[in-house]
């Protein structure tokens, strides 16, 4: 079996050294070249056709964002951004994802080059996962943008806690791009409340929700503890903790609760935990659960349970998934009412809500 050929792009010699050590400890991976800036990255990407590129953003001569844009235009390649775990780092990361990068790894706080080995396993998993991706080039090849302009918007003056459907969306690797294909396509008058469970660091989720809000007719924000679900509102679960939905006896308002339990959860927030909690607060036939691109099986079993109890479930197809792990598991377990490419999911949600 041929090895996964990786191009490392970083202006720090120490970071290039550490990344090479991390990647080459896996027998399935081969580092074919390194680049010190975006210009070298473009040249080596065109010359060597790597399977995966790891990309720094802040570099001399040509930055990572410019390099990503050029590479995705001329030789579409799975690109993983190595970003800072800061608000500024989050904003540039989301810009990189919009330009075509498939995923990111957030560098730990502190002396970055020394701490990069703390995320070694994440880097290895993501490189191997996106190398097999079929969705990266196909999504990039779609000419139309999911949005055309920013939509200025504030919280509705009169919150409406009654809604026809509850839309649950679970997603991991490749999630920001997939969500940009769905949420901006949903109309502002949608008679539904939306909850998104995205595997993402705590410092990233508020920035991501704000960015998604800029392009959406619906009101998008990071969920706060105790916040109510409302018609026309999209809540993004905070990173680093589990989100559950609860409703007090005799009160017809569903609220968000954050909890460190169950402790055995692998992912924080957990899709399974959030999806299962929805079954305790709302009639199953009012639930539309969507499982998108991601590694592993988080959310797959909850999809089975929602479908068995009368809810409607949609799994993203292999055609567009950056990593066809979570949706594939749901399909194989019988948890998908329907399988769709990501660009058809928003329209289908609108049909189901009607």
Curated annotation (Swiss-Prot):
The keyword Hydrolase applies. One of its GO terms (biological process) is chemotaxis. The modification 4-aspartylphosphate is found at residue 56. Residues 5-122 form the Response regulatory domain. Residues 159-354 form the CheB-type methylesterase domain. The active site is at 172, 199, 298. Phosphorylated by CheA. Phosphorylation of the N-terminal regulatory domain activates the methylesterase activity. The keyword Phosphoprotein applies. HAMAP family: CheB_chemtxs (MF_00099). Involved in chemotaxis. Part of a chemotaxis signal transduction system that modulates chemotaxis in response to various stimuli. Catalyzes the demethylation of specific methylglutamate residues introduced into the chemoreceptors (methyl-accepting chemotaxis proteins or MCP) by CheR. Also mediates the irreversible deamidation of specific glutamine residues to glutamic acid. NCBIfam families: PRK00742.1 (NF001965), PRK12555.1 (NF009206). This is Protein-glutamate methylesterase/protein-glutamine glutaminase 2. The lineage of its organism: Bacteria, Bacillati, Bacillota, Clostridia, Thermoanaerobacterales.
């Amino acid at each position: 079996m041929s090895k996964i050929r990786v191009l490392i792009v970083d202006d720090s010699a120490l970071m290039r050294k550490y990344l090479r050590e991390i990647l080459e400890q896996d027998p399935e991976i081969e580092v074919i070249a390194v680049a010190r800036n975006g210009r070298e990255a473009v040249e080596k990407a065109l010359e060597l056709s790597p399977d995966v590129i790891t990309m720094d953003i802040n570099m001399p001569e040509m930055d990572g964002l410019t390099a990503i844009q050029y590479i995705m235009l001329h030789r579409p390649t799975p690109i993983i951004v190595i970003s800072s775990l800061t608000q500024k780092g989050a904003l540039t990361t989301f810009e990189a994802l919009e330009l075509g990068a498939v995923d990111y790894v957030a560098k730990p706080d502190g002396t970055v080059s020394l701490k990069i080995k703390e995320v070694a396993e994440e880097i290895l998993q993501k490189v191997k996962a996106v190398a097999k991706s079929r969705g990266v080039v196909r999504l990039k090849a779609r000419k139309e943008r999911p949005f055309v302009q920013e939509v200025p918007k504030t919280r509705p003056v009169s919150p409406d806690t009654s809604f026809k459907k509850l839309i649950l969306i679970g997603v991991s690797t490749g999630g920001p791009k997939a969500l940009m294909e769905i949420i901006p396509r949903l109309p502002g008058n949608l008679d539904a409340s939306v909850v998104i469970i995205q595997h993402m660091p705590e410092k990233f989720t508020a920035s991501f929700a704000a960015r998604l809000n800029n392009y959406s007719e619906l009101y998008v924000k990071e969920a706060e503890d105790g916040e109510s679900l409302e018609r026309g509102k999209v809540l993004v679960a905070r990173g680093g903790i589990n989100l559950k939905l609860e409703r007090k006896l005799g009160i017809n308002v569903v609220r968000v609760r954050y909890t460190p339990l169950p402790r055995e959860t692998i992912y924080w927030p957990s899709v399974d935990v959030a999806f299962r909690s929805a079954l305790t607060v709302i009639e199953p036939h009012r639930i539309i659960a969507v499982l998108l691109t991601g590694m592993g099986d988080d959310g797959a079993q909850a999809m089975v349970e929602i479908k068995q109890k009368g809810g409607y479930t949609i799994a993203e197809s292999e055609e567009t998934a950056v990593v066809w792990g979570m949706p594939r598991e749901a399909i194989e377990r019988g948890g998908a009412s329907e399988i769709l490419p990501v660009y058809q999911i928003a329209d289908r949600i609108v049909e189901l809500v009607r």
